[in-house]
Amino acid sequence: MSKIIGIDLGTTNSCVSVLEGGEPKVIPNPEGNRTTPSVVAFKNGERQVGEVAKRQSVTNPNTIISIKSKMGTAEKVTVEDKDYTPQEVSAMILQYLKGYAEDYLGEKVTKAVITVPAYFNDAQRQATKDAGKIAGLEVERIINEPTAAALAYGLDKQDQDQKVLVFDLGGGTFDVSILELGDGVFEVLATAGDNKLGGDDFDDAIIEYLVAEFKKENGIDLSKDKMAMQRLKDAAEKAKKDLSGVTSTQISLPFITAGEAGPLHLEISLTRAKFDEITLPLVNRTVGPVRQALSDAGLSTSEIDQVILVGGSTRIPAVQEAVRKETNKEPHRGVNPDEVVAMGAAVQGGVLTGDVKDVVLLDVTPLSLGIETMGGVFTKLIDRNTTIPTSKSQVFSTAADNQPAVDIHVLQGERSMAADNKTLGRFQLADIPPAPRGVPQIEVTFDIDKNGIVSVKAKDLGTNKEQTIVIQSDSGLSEAEIERMVKDAEANADADAKRKEEADLRNEADQLVFQVDKTITDLGEQITEDEKKSVEDARDELKKALEAGELEGIKAAKEKLEGVLQPLVMKVYEQAAAAAQAAQGGEADAGAGKKDDGVVDADFEEVKDDK
């Protein structure tokens, strides 16, 4: 069976892992790094992903970052006059991860386990699955990030019974999950979180502080300057990372903007104490979900055996201190917070292929599910923290006499009124036979599958007529849209390959043009006027083809020039060999050896000159 890769599709960075010899292994990207920035950029119609996209983000306005925060929404990103859904942009990142995983494994990859924040709702989970499909991946399972982390942590500790609290603060989302581990069973007891809290918010707090300080000193508001804000974003992220290791850092941005008197520079020293002060409200927001999860699990902090920190933002000292204070535990430091989620996803992939035996994962739904009933009330059918997969039915009736149809409004959330919760979708059960209100029996059934994705069925028990929908939210993509995006993604992959082929061909052609001039110089008077004219004409033809930029034309001109140049190159080699033989005064065999040496030396010389 082909391998199932594990992907942590993060807000700031993504990571891909695979199970090798029963152990999860992180696959490095082409630059050799173990995580890849979740950044996509467009330049002159060309698409860039990862490190290269992030490096030029300051100067390229067509750069997309933190797209994960838009997953499950109908919001689109417009770049170079084209609209992209969050699913399409995420698919570009997934396609890149898939590509270098294939290079590493030496085989095609078609299946993946992708992680999502535990607090992702149905629309966000469905969007993630769609992104995988667009990228050419069969998403075998969507699993929660804290659960994946616990899976990687507990794989070699199956002989121990323990209760684990996973504190996951990533680039854009925050989750807390409490799990019970024992005898190969990983059971989630409770989960809580905040989908609008992460490392990006800590960066924004620093940016706000820098903008305010600069305005105070120079009277100029940098928040209106797009380029300055991008430079501030990079500087804030770097300062945040620095302050995890040192108590003070210097933020220096020369020529950040221009005033009446000329260019202005930003020079500010940021201490860890100041950073802690401006980010205190964010740190405090992590406390509520921790308490909520403990309460839902029916546990006190003394009953927690281990606290695992996940996500790059847990490196912030104030965050670690808040965790210590709230749990009365020293966090476990045996896992890499940036990689453990992808590794857990790879373990889950191994469970699905049968490579990992005797592991059972019992996850939960993070939010309650129900429907709107009379008076705009939210009636729950499945409570939050219910183990999935699950199914639940309840019988409802009509609100008016002779009501011909029932509108089913499906919601997810914890508030008592429907309007305050997240709408997952609406559908209608029609053709109900005329009857007084309260008489028809309408059975509504909720199903949540192993990926946390919801489907709902309504059935008229009198007529046995039923209507089923897999929830399709406003942001959901139809099969036709997904199919179109899959084709676009494949076309882009082909276009990228074609661009690479074109670049390689151009380089070879440029090298050949240079070689012509060098060969003419090396031969000096040994070359006849006819030979010289013939090779120069072929060279000029190739130069014109390069300017025209037509691939087939370049190929044809290059082949023609190679044919004309070959005899002249042989002349140069023979000349060099003869000169070497004369100098050595050697025998014929030795001369032949020198001729070989000449070939190698000339080859090396040319490559050096080209560089």
From Swiss-Prot:
Inducing stimuli: By stress conditions e.g. heat shock.
Compositional bias annotation for Acidic residues: 599-611
Any Pfam family hit: HSP70
Residue ranges, compositional bias (Low complexity): 577-591
Disulfide bonds: none
Any one GO MF annotation of this record: ATP-dependent protein folding chaperone
Renumbered residue ranges of the record's region Disordered: 577-611
Modified residues (Phosphothreonine): T173
Keywords: ATP-binding, Chaperone, Nucleotide-binding, Phosphoprotein, Stress response
Highest taxon listed in the record's lineage: Bacteria
Keyword Chaperone: yes
PANTHER family associated with the record: HEAT SHOCK PROTEIN 70KDA
Family of the protein in this entry: Belongs to the heat shock protein 70 family.
Function text: Acts as a chaperone.
Alphabetized HAMAP family for the sequence: DnaK
The protein, known as: Chaperone protein DnaK
Organism: Lysinibacillus sphaericus (strain C3-41)
Gene for this chain: dnaK
